[in-house]
Amino acid sequence: MFAVIKTGGKQYKVAENDVIDIEKLEADEGATVEFDSVLALGDTVGLPTIAGAKVTGEVLSQFRGEKVIIFKKHRRQNYRRKNGHRQFLTRVRITGFAGV
């Protein structure tokens, strides 16, 4: 069985025991988190979400992602700007589904 959850402005297709990297959640390592915004659960599709459905997970770690380089340039103007960014992420293991 699988579910589609929405968190951090993105959608993830998950199954039990999957490990996913999502946008940072304010939770400590080992904490249990619940995702209430379930868009699909098995054959059931929500409009836009499924009322009463929840997906639970366990926080494995908090970390920063790979560096993304932003480079801006204007030709013939000697204008060059280089900037780097590392996003804060949370690694979560999906432990179960509840609801429909």
Curated annotation (Swiss-Prot):
The keyword RNA-binding applies. GO terms for biological process: translation. Signal peptide: none annotated. Keywords: Ribonucleoprotein, Ribosomal protein, RNA-binding, rRNA-binding. Pfam families: Ribosomal_L21p. One of its GO terms (molecular function) is rRNA binding. GO terms for cellular component: cytoplasm; ribonucleoprotein complex; ribosome. InterPro entries: bL21-like, bL21-like_sf, Ribosomal_bL21. Part of the 50S ribosomal subunit. Contacts protein L20. This protein binds to 23S rRNA in the presence of protein L20. Belongs to the bacterial ribosomal protein bL21 family. This is Large ribosomal subunit protein bL21.
